[in-house]
From Swiss-Prot:
InterPro entries: P-loop_NTPase, Thymidylate_kin-like_dom, Thymidylate_kin_CS, Thymidylate_kinase. This is Thymidylate kinase. Phosphorylation of dTMP to form dTDP in both de novo and salvage pathways of dTTP synthesis. It comes from Streptococcus pneumoniae serotype 4 (strain ATCC BAA-334 / TIGR4). The gene is tmk. GO terms for cellular component: cytosol.
Amino acid sequence: MSKGFLVSLEGPEGAGKTSVLEALLPILEEKGVEVLTTREPGGVLIGEKIREVILDPSHTQMDAKTELLLYIASRRQHLVEKVLPALEAGKLVIMDRFIDSSVAYQGFGRGLDIEAIDWLNQFATDGLKPDLTLYFDIEVEEGLARIAANSDREVNRLDLEGLDLHKKVRQGYLSLLDKEGNRIVKIDASLPLEQVVETTKAVLFDGMGLAK
């Protein structure tokens, strides 16, 4: 790779993004691809501290705009401190959530102004967008059932939200898919993990121009 390649993983709660990424890493390493994996919110010390504030289950009174601005602040710090240097070094950067999460969660989910969110994303990222976004789609009820069945997963504030919010979030992602289908690829996350990994691998390799 002569320059970096930015991939974002998106999807509703319980879509299994993390499991897919864990399965993909050894495959990419075998190909000799230098990979940086990271997440939002978080990824760097300041971002992880912001993550704690956002996801703390006791912070039930958090205002929607406060929530959005915290995500944006984490995004900026994460980008400057970790993501941009890796891209400049020619690495493949895979981010667990990025700009589309703000549109889906705070825009469609919380009902905040989409244009304002787009402006804040533009401001925080200086216009950077992923080269490829993998959207892992799953019915809301199935995703939440997966979370409930996973005893190892720590419950966060978003897990405590009602079904209505999560349905709006999924609708937001589907709207983004319609709008930016050249960048966003939908992957059926309800299938067995092995199939999801194979599909994801094929889409990623194709996007990066790697031999399968």
